[in-house]
Amino acid sequence: MKTSQFLSLLLLAGIAQAIVPPREPRPPTGGGNKLLTYKECVPRATISPRSTSLAWINSDEDGQYISQSDDGALILQNIVTNTNKTLVAADKVPKGYYDYWFKPDLSAVLWATNYTKQYRHSYFANYFILDIEKGSLTPLSQDQAGDIQYAQWSPMDNSIAYVRGNDLYIWNNGKTKRITENGGPDIFNGVPDWVYEEEIFGDRFALWFSPDGEYLAYLRFNETGVPTYTIPYYKNKQKIAPAYPRELEIRYPKVSAKNPTVQFHLLNIASSQETTIPVTAFPENDLVIGEVAWLSSGHDSVAYRAFNRVQDREKIVSVKVESKESKVIRERDGTDGWIDNLLSMSYIGDVNGKEYYVDISDASGWAHIYLYPVDGGKEIALTTGEWEVVAILKVDTKKKLIYFTSTKYHSTTRHVYSVSYDTKVMTPLVNDKEAAYYTASFSAKGGYYILSYQGPNVPYQELYSTKDSKKPLKTITSNDALLEKLKEYKLPKVSFFEIKLPSGETLNVKQRLPPNFNPHKKYPVLFTPYGGPGAQEVSQAWNSLDFKSYITSDPELEYVTWTVDNRGTGYKGRKFRSAVAKRLGFLEPQDQVFAAKELLKNRWADKDHIGIWGWSYGGFLTAKTLETDSGVFTFGISTAPVSDFRLYDSMYTERYMKTVELNADGYSETAVHKVDGFKNLKGHYLIQHGTGDDNVHFQNAAVLSNTLMNGGVTADKLTTQWFTDSDHGIRYDMDSTYQYKQLAKMVYDQKQRKPERPPMHQWSKRVLAALFGERAEE
């Protein structure tokens, strides 16, 4: 096994002993004797770091943010001077509110109440406007009934754009103007449908005010003809189950099915004049709009990012608002893989007499920051190298600086940098010569930032001025209590390293060893991959003391866990990512098997007890890994797995696999269809799935279990567990409690399992032999 020297951070001196990063002059603390318990780790970690997230306010005084006092009042505070002012008294705060947003001039608050969850990001609510000076509370709509889908303040005046019944409205000083009249079950104005919310925007809105507040760009989605998927809810949150389940019908486009069509619209707020802008970048049935961004400080120009259906070609189209003229200002062919929708376009303004916007692109093979001319032309690279920019944190147009996080040190790390788009000088804001994981949150005017150290040691947060990144102004979150708590425990020993594939690529590995690890003993091992395209599980972020830490710590279990990021995962360059294009489930299980064989070079690894467990894509990867019939893995658990990507949504799947018409053989191979690997397991295979899963439908588990049963996988090898009405997270009605107890029992039983096959009743042998042949007698 090849181990990278700089990454062999055996956190014996780190997490295991709760080292404080070198910012504080205190020595490492000693470990205790307590071991993590089930209740402390499951269903979610109870011993965990705290963090502070601030709602920065753009005002004349930089460093201001909104906080809430113990009695519920909303306070305007300055993080630097510690001065504060009560904006909303506690008795003016609506009871049971869900969220709130201040008007930009701080004269009013928009409240969301009566929250009802819809999908992953979207919800319905009532909205009220509080006039701070008058103390009056006014409903956004007089007849609202917890049915408003989204609402947003204009950046400049007293207007609110909101969506109700899939129609767009503009509220201004108590008067409401209905903008669209066609909203309904199939037409969405200003909010995304299910597939755009889940796979494209990752959010609940599809409208964008111009910086001067005079125009609104929005998208209209038409789901007419998109196939419907029906989800039954058997209990439907009732004490007594209804005789007929409630049925939720979702327009859910699966692979090669009809997608929703999308239109681009502009609204003049003052005149209420609405204009449909023709989108000609791709044909209507071959179009995905992935991003909208204003490319001006007023409302001169707005752009949208258009993809073809399978998202391997893109065009950035600029629209001149006054003339309504459209122009392709940038395009790219990414048919060597796919093009990620990073939602990173931001207007910069004038640079040496020409207007630019900033964006992230991996066209060079690595994701980097570029300046692009607003009217098209040659781009300017601001960062380069065989590492990746992860996210743009802040654009400071006055200082001509862009703040961002990157993997420059290593793909598992994150460090914060600035780059000048005037001089192209790149400057670290942290010590970028250590394996660490940072991010930052910048004040509205960019004068201050909260630096968040997120691992691998005990996290903390500090306030800095952008004028001096060497000396913190104050500590925001110390996590001293966590540090003291950890002194009581012996924690899993965590290390990071790389293993090298025969083809030359390296895979990142995170290893957890039991607290009382003895290299002369034998230990069962559980692999815990996710492994999906562009994802990352192996990082230097804080090691959550969750279920994986529990099974490592429990004296009756003492599992070693390995998390391996296979080919196709993120932050190691485009070539590494794109290797899985058109063949999901082919390379990923090969890499997991290779890693397991490398693991078995360790004398302490028990070859008879090597398991693999994954959720969602990880559940799919678990099944595909067992399907290889490698003989390395002896048991597996798939939670909420995809079993055949022809059953999953179009916009995610086709990005990586293309359509069935273009890649029929690829889809056939990607589906879990070979059963010998499951039949030959020394141990057991468990499938868990929620029947109310609106993302990865229960259909996947049903099809998978049927495939395995009909293929001859015997009852001593296979268990299927459904969770009534639970969604993809399996959280309905205490389901997660049962789920994790089942997981704990599974890994315990598998550790206790003897290598030889358990005895069977004679009638079982005869029945199995009749059904599946003499193999059942073996």
From Swiss-Prot:
Its main location: secreted. It holds the Pfam family Peptidase_S9. GO terms for molecular function: aminopeptidase activity; dipeptidyl-peptidase activity; serine-type endopeptidase activity. Keywords: Aminopeptidase, Glycoprotein, Hydrolase, Protease, Secreted, Serine protease, Signal, Virulence. It comes from the Eukaryota. It is an enzyme of class 3 (hydrolase). One of its GO terms (cellular component) is plasma membrane. It catalyses: Release of an N-terminal dipeptide, Xaa-Yaa-|-Zaa-, from a polypeptide, preferentially when Yaa is Pro, provided Zaa is neither Pro nor hydroxyproline. Glycans are attached at N84, N114, N222. The active site is at S616, D693, H728. It is found in: Secreted. GO terms for biological process: proteolysis. Transmembrane segments: none annotated. Belongs to the peptidase S9B family. PANTHER family: DIPEPTIDYL PEPTIDASE 4-RELATED (PTHR11731:SF162), PROTEASE FAMILY S9B,C DIPEPTIDYL-PEPTIDASE IV-RELATED (PTHR11731). Extracellular dipeptidyl-peptidase which removes N-terminal dipeptides sequentially from polypeptides having unsubstituted N-termini provided that the penultimate residue is proline. Contributes to pathogenicity. This is Probable dipeptidyl peptidase 4. The lineage of its organism: Eukaryota, Fungi, Dikarya, Ascomycota, Pezizomycotina.
